């Protein structure tokens, strides 16, 4: 069984680490986070691995997962490459072995963020599961059937695909130059949805709708909209004043929302324009 070291073990790292441990695909070895306490919590959740908060403590591994925030991927790769170079000069073996695979979990950034590790002969990739990792325990139950975008060196993606297949995801290839737009699609599909739901609930609350009825409104409309989109597609599922060309109501309603919250008013106008364009398509 191949070993994996995990650097940065938040919600994504913990979910994937536990899934691979439970499925006996990877042997979770070392788990590195900024805080030893958080590393220990991650190890406890995964049921495997050794917690550390020092690069110098990391041991050789076949696979390295950098599950750190996007803004920290490049600097983490630099630090790891520097540490690996110093290890290679000492009595310790190269921590990745020849050749190791290193991948990060960003949906927006390409595997080129890991470029410093290429000097070690490592193969590089990125792997992005299209799943909301709001809670690792819940995410574990949702991995089955979820899509996973793989990008990077062919040898690395070829080796990673069986790992993600084992935990139930469905992999597909993605070109590095398309990652930003691809991830923006995911942001529109899921990340903005809670924002829109929160705005709707605020509007209902400030309109005097009782809390229990607002919750019922939210549940009914959300389920109805999702069901229609999945069954009919976005164009046929679209309803509302912009979709039916009621520009007068869109204007009046937009002004009312802008008075209530200027930023929400701008969002209303922008989304209404997009809705009208979609309806006309």
Describe these PLM feature segments.
Residues 1-54:
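NAD(P)+-binding Rossmann beta1-loop-alpha1 motif at the extreme N-terminus of oxidoreductases
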Residues 9, 106, 152-155:
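Short coil/turn segments
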Residues 14, 18-22, 44, 78, ...:
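Short, well-ordered alpha-helices that flank and scaffold nucleotide-derived cofactor binding pockets
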Residues 29-33, 102-105, 150-151, 275:
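Short, hydrophobic beta-strand segments that form beta-sheet elements in well-ordered domains
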Residues 36, 45-138:
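Rossmann-like NAD(P)(H) cofactor-binding subdomain of soluble oxidoreductases
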Residues 38-45, 121, 138-230, 278-279:
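Internal alpha-helical scaffold of NAD(P)-dependent oxidoreductase catalytic cores
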Residues 215-281:
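NAD(P)-dependent Rossmann-like dehydrogenase/reductase catalytic/cofactor-binding core
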């Amino acid at each position: 069984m191949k070993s994996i070291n995990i650097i940065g073990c938040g919600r994504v790292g913990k979910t994937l680490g536990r899934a691979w441990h439970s499925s006996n695909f990877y042997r979770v070895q070392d788990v590195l986070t900024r805080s030893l306490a958080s590393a220990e919590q991650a190890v406890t959740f995964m049921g495997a691995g050794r917690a550390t908060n020092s690069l110098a403590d990391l041991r050789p591994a076949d696979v390295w997962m950098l599950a750190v925030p996007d803004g920290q991927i490049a600097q983490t790769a630099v630090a790891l490459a520097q540490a690996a170079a110093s290890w290679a000069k000492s009595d310790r073996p190269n921590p990745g072995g020849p050749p190791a695979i290193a991948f990060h979990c960003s949906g927006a950034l390409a595997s080129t963020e890991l470029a410093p590790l290429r000097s070690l002969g490592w193969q590089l990739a990125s792997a992005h599961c299209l799943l909301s990792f709001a809670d690792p325990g819940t995410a574990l139950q949702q991995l089955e059937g979820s899509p996973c975008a793989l990008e990077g060196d062919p040898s690395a993606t070829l080796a990673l695909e069986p790992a993600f297949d084992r935990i139930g995801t469905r992999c597909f290839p993605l070109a590095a130059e398309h990652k930003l737009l691809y991830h923006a699609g995911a942001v529109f599909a899921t990340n903005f949805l809670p924002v829109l739901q929160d705005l709707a609930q605020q509007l209902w609350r400030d309109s005097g709708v009782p809390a229990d009825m607002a919750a019922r409104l939210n549940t009914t409309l959300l389920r109805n909209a999702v069901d229609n989109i999945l069954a009919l597609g976005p164009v046929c599922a679209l309803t509302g004043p912009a979709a039916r060309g009621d520009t007068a109501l869109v204007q009046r309603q937009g002004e009312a929302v802008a008075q209530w919250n200027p930023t929400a008013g701008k969002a209303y106008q922008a989304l209404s324009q997009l809705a009208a364009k979609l309806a006309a398509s």
